[in-house]
Amino acid sequence: VLDSFAHADIGPVDSRAGRIIMEAEAELEDAVPNISMKYDKDLTSDEYAIKAVECALKCAKPSFANHKMFVNELGENYVLASCYNGLALGGGSYTLCRLILGGIAKKSDSIDDFKNNKLPYVMDIMARYMDARIRFEVEESGFFENNFLAKEGFIYRDRFTAMFGLVGLADAVNILLAKEGIEGRFGKTENATQLGVEIMDIINDFNNDHKNKYCEYTGGHFLLHAQVGIAE
């Protein structure tokens, strides 16, 4: 397993194993594996949560994930990968592609052009690209017939989905407002925050309207994925 994808989950209930893991990580201060704490105020004791906070202050992990939210969306048998990506236990993501919103905003003439032309155009291309990758993986690659993990029953094709990612919402909002000569900064002014919400609504509606037959575990839709940042 590549370092970037080596991940462990603890919680939501207190456990000896979870405590040992946090004690070891606080002492070692290593980067691998990444760790998430499934946190639920009704299941996670304050003492256990404080232990996790103390560990995070020393080694920047675990991250805290909203257990109730993930259970509501994916059921009890879910796991977390790379901090906050909820996926089915025994499943995974066929692919992860990203809308670089700041780049799309730079190529847009106005907020209206971004919303009604440039963003829909790029979303359509990315969705069709993801569909093609998924079709190849399932129908041609032989991965789910021949991979060791599938043969041994660790992963199942029908528990897989894909992640429709995005990065740079704040960049996009700030760029678009500047193009229109409107004052405002994402996260600081109401008009900028509202524009961000409108952009996310457009992306969410597109994703809900798009169907992929091999993403049946998530209702035939991709999962939206928010990227923290991107190098280029």
What does each of the following model-derived ranges do?
Residues V1-D158, K179, R185-T193, V197-E232:
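Conserved catalytic cores of very large enzyme subunits
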Residues A162-I175, D201:
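Contiguous, well-ordered alpha-helical segments that form the cores/surfaces of helical PPI scaffolds
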